[in-house]
């Protein structure tokens, strides 16, 4: 009969509990709907699902409707009116209000009138007002692009964090398996009388630390996954798996001038400022159109009764119609508009300064981002070399420990150094991608 001593029983229980802990998260995730997604797929989903993007798409749609409303000014205006009245008797008196006489009048009165007018000249006010609204719509489109960038960048951060945590989970799982193997080997060495129980305890403590770190990683993965699922309006049970080819892809290394040129042409803030200047130019022309008269073609018809300009009043209807040209000019614009133009020119100067400031800011931001991007490659090379050295160091220390040439503390230190190097390498690789985006 094989008798299990107390220490062996304790180790068996620990191993069983560990296996259960490792299996449980996997079984929980298995109940979820796993979905491998690339960054471009996230962006496409965000375009249709993101609440933030939908808000600014509504703003663009509203700007389109503003243009449609403004174009109504090109259409003719048609007005119709109708009224029914009760008319009293007419009173006629001398100019000094003496000798007044009352004349009976028909008491029912009616009035039907219709008038149509078409503006044929307004000094360009309608045309330039529509042009200003079209520019306003383009500004709203760049605002939409800016907020899309914000959403994309937020998604990229969550996605790369999720990728990093999953890679780190693989690193920790591998190190935990190696730690379990070391513990098994130490138990064998203890049974042979060449290792102390204290040596095993050190590695068991390290294993427990790794287990806790793994639990933290699983929690971080769930948090990032929930954020992505919520932003993209996906089912709550969706488990997003990052595209594993991302790390193997070669990141481009264009010169800074290329990035500067792209930013100069495509930066939402720069394009918004340029369009703001263009819109102010159109508004200036709208204001100047106020110095010009407005000319319209008009036509109308009027049917009314009774005929009150005859005495006695005639109980008849009379119909009149007319066609002509109307001229309207606001004389007050002569002394009011110069102040409006002065205020507008101040706004133009301010917009020029804002554009220059924005160009400078974008240029500095691109330079800083490009510098960090290049630095991330250098960091990756450094961490890659550190990982190589840490692995070589661990292999040497493990071999020496197997031959009783070093203490277990040296082996633990070497193992910790290797784990740290592996973690830093994964972080450095993800950092390159993050700085690129």
State where each predicted segment sits:
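Periplasmic alpha-helical coiled-coil/stalk elements that build and connect Gram-negative outer-membrane
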Residues: 3, 37-41, 150-262, 372, ...
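Bacterial N-terminal signal peptides that target proteins for export
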Residues: 6-17
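Bacterial Sec-pathway N-terminal export signals of envelope proteins
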Residues: 20, 28-83, 236-278, 330, ...
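Small/polar, glycine/serine/threonine/aspartate-rich low-complexity segments that form flexible
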Residues: 31-35, 81-118, 243-253, 285, ...
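A glycine-/polar-enriched beta->alpha junction
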Residues: 44-54, 61-76, 106, 113-132, ...
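Amphipathic alpha-helical coiled-coil segments
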Residues: 55-70, 147, 151-170, 224, ...
């Amino acid at each position: 009969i094989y008798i299990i001593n107390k220490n062996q029983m304790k180790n068996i229980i620990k191993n069983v509990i560990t296996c259960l802990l490792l299996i449980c998260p996997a079984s929980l995730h298995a109940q979820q709907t796993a979905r491998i997604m690339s960054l471009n797929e996230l962006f496409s989903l965000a375009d249709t699902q993101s609440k933030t993007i939908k808000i600014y798409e509504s703003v663009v749609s509203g700007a389109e409707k503003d243009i449609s409303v403004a174009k109504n000014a090109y259409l003719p205006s048609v007005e119709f009116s109708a009224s029914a009245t009760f008319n009293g008797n007419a009173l006629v008196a001398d100019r000094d209000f003496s000798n007044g006489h009352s004349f009976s009048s028909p008491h029912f009165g009616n009035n039907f009138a219709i008038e149509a007018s078409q503006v044929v000249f307004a000094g360009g006010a309608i045309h330039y007002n529509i042009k200003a609204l079209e520019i306003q719509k383009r500004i709203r489109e760049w605002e939409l692009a800016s907020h899309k960038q914000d959403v994309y960048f937020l998604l990229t951060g969550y996605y790369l964090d999720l990728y990093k945590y999953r890679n780190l989970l693989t690193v920790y799982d591998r190190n935990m398996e190696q730690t379990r193997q070391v513990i098994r080997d130490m138990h064998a060495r203890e049974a042979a009388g060449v290792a102390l129980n204290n040596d095993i305890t050190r590695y068991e403590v390290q294993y427990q630390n790794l287990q806790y770190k793994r639990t933290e990683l699983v929690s971080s993965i769930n948090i990032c996954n929930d954020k992505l699922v919520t932003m993209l309006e996906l089912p709550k049970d969706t488990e997003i798996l990052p595209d594993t080819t991302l790390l193997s892809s070669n990141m481009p290394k264009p010169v800074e001038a290329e990035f500067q040129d792209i930013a100069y042409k495509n930066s939402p803030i720069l394009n918004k400022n340029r369009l703001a200047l263009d819109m102010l130019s159109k508004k200036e022309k709208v204001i100047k159109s106020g110095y010009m008269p407005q000319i319209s073609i008009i036509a109308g018809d009027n049917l009314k009764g009774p005929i009150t300009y005859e005495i006695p009043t005639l109980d008849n209807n009379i119909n009149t119609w007319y066609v002509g040209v109307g001229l309207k000019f606001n004389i007050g614009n002569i002394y009011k508009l110069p102040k409006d133009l002065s205020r507008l020119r101040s706004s133009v100067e301010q917009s020029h300064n804002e554009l220059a400031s924005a160009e400078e800011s974008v240029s500095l931001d691109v330079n800083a981002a490009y510098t960090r991007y290049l630095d991330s490659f250098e960091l990756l090379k450094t961490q890659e070399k550190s990982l190589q050295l840490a692995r070589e160091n661990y292999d040497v220390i493990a071999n020496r420990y197997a031959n009783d040439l070093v203490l277990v503390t040296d082996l633990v230190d070497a193992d910790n150094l290797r784990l740290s190097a592996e973690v830093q390498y994964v972080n450095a690789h993800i950092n390159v991608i993050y700085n690129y985006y």
